[in-house]
Regions:
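N-terminal segment of the mature folded domain
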Residues: 86-125
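Ligand-binding clefts/hinges and TM-proximal coupling segments of bilobed small-molecule sensing domains
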Residues: 144, 150-169, 240-310
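Pocket-lining segment of extracytoplasmic ligand-binding domains
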Residues: 97-99, 106-115, 135-139, 177-277
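An extracytoplasmic/periplasmic, membrane-proximal ligand-sensing/linker region
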Residues: 204-227, 235-238, 279-349
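Sec/Tat signal peptide C-region and signal peptidase I cleavage site
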Residues: 23-32
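Bilobed "Venus flytrap"/periplasmic-binding protein-like clamshell domains
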Residues: 37-63, 68-71, 130-196, 204-205, ...
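Extracytoplasmic small-molecule ligand-binding "clamshell" domains
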Residues: 51-87, 256-258, 348
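Bacterial N-terminal signal peptides that target proteins for export
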Residues: 1-16
Length: 349
């Protein structure tokens, strides 16, 4: 690990540098020197955000005509990745509606945070994730509702992850005691089997894709998903939460205790600093729009985006309308007759 300014910790730095050098070595000397850099910060290796970023980086490099080298940089969590971009360590940040909301309000991990570069603005929203909790099958009879996890040791995903933040706010809304135990993702199955944690947050993308560490856990461990109870769902809806239905057959390869589960969704995206050029960001968004069906074939998590690309951008902006929209996205939405004059356009580019 390499310590970074502002407390950020960059994982796999040597791998990232090696990847850049390898790409540069394939280019003619003049071209390698002329290519500009776009640093794409994500969550740590093994997370869904990191895994799919590599595929999107290839699409983006092609769309930009070889003018840029896109480097995927893994960080401890999306929160750290966001801060890294706003302290000059990247241009594109992996984030979600909940993280953008906390940043806008300067709450949670963003309390007292002071960016040293122009701030993140709405740019591109890519897929929803659905937060649930799973337990080892041998312990399933002990847990019927989420209230049964109150005050119990649970791995709520990596601290600072958007699903971790989502679980934290859910517990707060329901009045439950949030007792997080931090473990390595690779230890997820063992921790559940041994009882180090009694539950672990499990999440799907678009009700389909599991993160890499949960795919591994699915092979190694028999587990059950603990559904929200009706009174919990009612309380969350009354507080303004959306509830998504996840069909087990679309997300899991084995019996996990039911055919459908109710989950609390969050919307993930890749937002950039306000000072990135309008033309660059417009080309980026248009490339993902044009390649949306191709992205869906690469990973089913992109299915909702492919079906309603424009609507997903509108949803992302409306989640935190106090945050400005990048001029590149504003141009794209105006072309598609989807711009809302109540939104504000960032003036930093």
């Amino acid at each position: 690990m390499t310590a970074r300014k502002g407390g950020a910790i960059l994982l796999g730095a040597a791998t990232t540098v090696a990847a850049v050098l390898a790409v540069s070595a394939l280019l003619p000397p003049a071209e390698a020197q002329q290519r500009k850099s776009l640093r794409w910060t994500t969550a740590q290796v093994g997370s869904y955000g990191y895994t799919v970023a590599a595929s999107m980086a290839k699409v983006l490099e092609q769309a930009l005509g070889g003018e840029y080298t896109v480097t995927v940089q893994p960080y401890q969590s999306p929160t750290v990745a966001m801060k890294a971009v706003m302290t000059g360590e990247g241009e594109i940040a992996y984030t979600a509606d909940i993280g953008m909301g906390e940043f806008a309000e300067r709450t949670g991990p963003f309390k007292d945070f002071k960016p040293t570069t122009p701030e993140l603005v709405h740019t591109w929203y890519a897929y929803p994730m659905e937060t649930m909790i799973a337990v080892a099958a041998k312990d399933a009879d002990k847990y019927k509702c989420w209230k049964d996890f109150s005050g119990k040791p649970v791995y709520f995903s990596q601290a600072g992850f958007q699903n971790w933040l989502n679980a934290q706010r859910i517990f707060k809304t329901l009045g439950y005691d949030f007792k997080h135990v931090q473990i390595d993702n690779k230890a997820n199955a063992d921790a559940l089997e041994r009882g180090t944690v009694v539950g672990s947050v499990i999440y799907t993308t678009a009700g389909r894709s599991l993160p890499a560490y949960w795919k591994e856990s699915e092979v190694r461990l028999d587990f059950k998903v603990v559904d929200l109870c009706p009174d919990e769902v009612a309380k969350l809806k009354a507080a303004g939460y959306g509830i998504a239905e996840v069909e087990a057959k679309n997300a899991f390869t084995k019996d996990v205790g039911g055919t459908k589960f109710e989950a609390v969704p969050i919307l993930f995206g890749y937002n950039v600093r306000a000072d990135l050029p309008e033309d660059l960001v417009y080309k980026m968004i248009k490339a993902f729009y044009d390649k949306r069906d191709e992205l869906m074939k690469i990973d089913p998590g992109f299915t909702p985006m492919a079906k309603d690309f424009i609507g997903m951008q509108v949803q992302g902006i409306n989640s935190t309308p106090q945050i400005a929209v990048h001029p590149g996205l504003a141009k794209f939405l105006k072309e598609h007759k989807a711009w809302n004059d109540k939104w504000k356009i960032a003036g930093g580019s």
